[in-house]
């Protein structure tokens, strides 16, 4: 049998037991040994079947401790709204000109925001933005006349979440360099947002399992009673 890489054999902590959120965070951080500031990621198994329209889960949460990411924002807007977006810190602002850039392959951004009147234009980029999860949507606040606030939210810790086919939500909730307390606050904020987004068709236990991991490290189970789930 081939030897496991040293990075794997060096992992510490019980991966089978369910830990309090504080203990799980400490274990994840202790195993985040890459030479870069690893993202701390959460996975939440939900008691839903996303194949049914009344069991979809989608929303946005403003993480109190931020994300630790430098979020690059593109905004489709004109005139005064374009000026507001630029003043709020958006990296790329435009209308037809921005459409042409993206249609030509430009993708140097992490979030797309649009004013409602721009959606007819933005909709033509569906095949480009949709598969990447970048299509603006009013349900998560990225189609809005208040582009300045949307830009500030995106850069200040707003994280979109959406249930995947297997009934799982994945999200980044900070960096390994964050304090344990800051990460715990973000975890609890996301869980609260998920509970608020519980669909009408969900029956039985909604939040079934929660796990935490880092970009390059192992995952650890979280005792859901420790996060009020």
UniProtKB/Swiss-Prot annotation:
NCBIfam families: rplA_bact (TIGR01169). Part of the 50S ribosomal subunit. GO terms for biological process: regulation of translation; translation. This is Large ribosomal subunit protein uL1. Pfam families: Ribosomal_L1 (PF00687). The gene is rplA. PROSITE patterns: RIBOSOMAL_L1. It comes from Caulobacter vibrioides (strain NA1000 / CB15N). Coiled coil: none annotated. Binds directly to 23S rRNA. The L1 stalk is quite mobile in the ribosome, and is involved in E site tRNA release. GO terms for molecular function: rRNA binding; structural constituent of ribosome; tRNA binding. GO terms for cellular component: cytosolic large ribosomal subunit.
């Amino acid at each position: 049998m081939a030897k496991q890489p040293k990075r794997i054999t060096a992992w510490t902590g019980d991966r089978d037991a369910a830990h309090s959120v504080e203990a799980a965070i400490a274990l994840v951080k202790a195993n985040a040994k890459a030479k870069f500031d690893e993202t701390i990621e959460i996975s939440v198994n939900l008691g839903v079947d996303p194949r049914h329209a009344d069991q979809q889960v989608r929303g946005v949460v403003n993480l109190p401790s931020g994300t630790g990411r430098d979020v690059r924002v593109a905004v489709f807007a004109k005139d005064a709204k374009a000026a507001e977006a630029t003043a709020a810190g958006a990296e790329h602002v435009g209308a037809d000109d921005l459409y042409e850039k993206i249609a030509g392959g430009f993708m140097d951004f992490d979030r797309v925001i649009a004013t409602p009147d721009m959606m007819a234009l933005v909709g033509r980029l569906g095949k480009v933005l949709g598969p990447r999860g970048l299509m603006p949507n009013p349900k998560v606040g990225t189609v809005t006349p208040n582009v300045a606030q949307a830009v500030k939210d995106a850069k200040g810790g707003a994280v979109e979440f959406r249930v995947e086919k297997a009934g799982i939500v994945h999200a980044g909730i900070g960096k390994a360099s964050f304090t344990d307390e800051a990460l715990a606050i973000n975890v609890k904020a996301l869980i609260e947002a998920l509970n608020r987004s519980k669909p009408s068709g969900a029956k039985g236990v909604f939040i079934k399992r929660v796990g935490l991991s880092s970009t390059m490290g192992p995952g650890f189970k979280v005792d859901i009673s420790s996060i009020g789930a």
